[in-house]
Amino acid sequence: MKAIAIVGSPRKKGNTEFLTNHTLTAIAEEGMETELISLAGKDIRGCNACMVCREKETCPIDDDLFPLYEKAKAAEAIILATPVYFGSATSNIKAFMDRAGYIAGAERRFAGKIGGPLVVARRAGQNFTHAQLMYWFHILGFYMAGSTYWNIAFGRGIGEVEQDEEGLNTAWNFGKNVAFLTKKVHG
C-alpha cells in the first residue's frame, strides 16, 4: 500500500515539505510505502473547463499534471500539503486539485481512498485553507483521516515550523491515522 503527498509549495525544502516528510515518516513506520511529490518547478496550468475529461480519462493541456494524476490514482492514500498564500492554498496545488479532481471525479476514480490536508501558515488563513483542501477530499469520496487537532503548523522562515511542537505532533498523529485507515480499508 502506498501513500503519496503532493506538496504545493513553490519552495523546495521549505516548511511545508518538512512537515509533510514528518507525516510521511509516521506513515512509513507503519509499513507503508510513501512518496513526496513537490510541485515546485513543475508546469501545472489551471483548468480551462473544456470538459474533455468528462468523456475520457485525459486532459488536453500539455504539462506536468497527468503523470502526477496517474500516481495519485495508483495510491491508496493521498495527502495534499500547502502553505497559506494570501489567505488560501497556493495556485499550483489549486491547479492540481481542479484538474485532477475533474479527471477523477466523473467516474469517482478517487472514491474510497484515504486522504487529508496539511497546512503551514505564518499566522492566519490556515482554517480556510484547511477547509479548502478538505472539501476536495470530501467531494471526491475520500475517507478523511483526522488527528489530535487541525492538521496545521506554523512557521514563516525556512525551518521555523520545526519549532511548532504541537503542529509536529498533530502532523505525526495524522500520519499514523492515515496508515491505520488505509490498512483497515485497503488491507
Task: Tell where the protein language model's regions lie, with residue ranges.
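Cysteine-centered iron-sulfur cluster-binding motifs in ferredoxin-type domains/subunits
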Residues: 8, 12-17, 45-54, 76
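Helix-loop-strand module that forms the ligand-binding subsite of alpha/beta enzymes
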Residues: 60-143, 148-149
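N-terminal beta1-alpha1 ligand-phosphate binding loop
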Residues: 2-32
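Cysteine-cluster motifs in flexible loop/terminal segments that predominantly coordinate metals
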Residues: 42-72
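Glycine-rich phosphate/pyrophosphate-binding loop and the adjoining helix
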Residues: 1, 29, 67, 138-187
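A short beta-strand-loop structural module common to alpha/beta enzyme folds
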Residues: 32-42
